[in-house]
Amino acid sequence: ARTIATMLLSDVDLKSYTDTAYHNEELKSLTRYRFDKVQERAKLKQSVSRLVTILFPELEQLVSSIHGTSIYALLSEYPGAKQISEAHLTRLANILVKTSRGHYRKDKATHIRDAARTSIGSVTPAKSLELKHTIKLIQELTSEINEIEDAIRKIMDELKPPILSIPGMGFHSAAMILAEVGDFSNFNSPD
């Protein structure tokens, strides 16, 4: 009580807790949370690269990226060169065509299966299981990141910060800067 009375008697100009301050705290929490999730996903992607190198090293030379949706779908169902080499070509082609929205065709499935048949990759059921689970975790993290980004976008749409009008300033960068700096009017000068 004494502290409150002293504070009220002193001539301190107290600012009320505004919606902007609330949104800033929310934005700060969300951008930091998103950053952590992206870092976590990056580590898992490194694990996928390591596991593919063990199980089917030739795959990286056959596709533009092993981290695409279609390759994840393929590896989720056939997590290794041995499994791919034994798969029916029509099934492989269907997975690739469907998940790549036509980017990959039957000829790509044929190339991948042929490479799998002559692969130097190890046949390791434990690593294959780890690969499947790691891909599931990446997909779940991607879903969570998208949900976080939707929440960030909602706050940014409410705030309509002028920082977004800066050429080259992306949505994520603007949100992170705004979250960490807060209200720019709190600064007397640019220095």
Predicted regions and their residues:
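A detector of single, family-specific signature residues
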Residues: 1-191
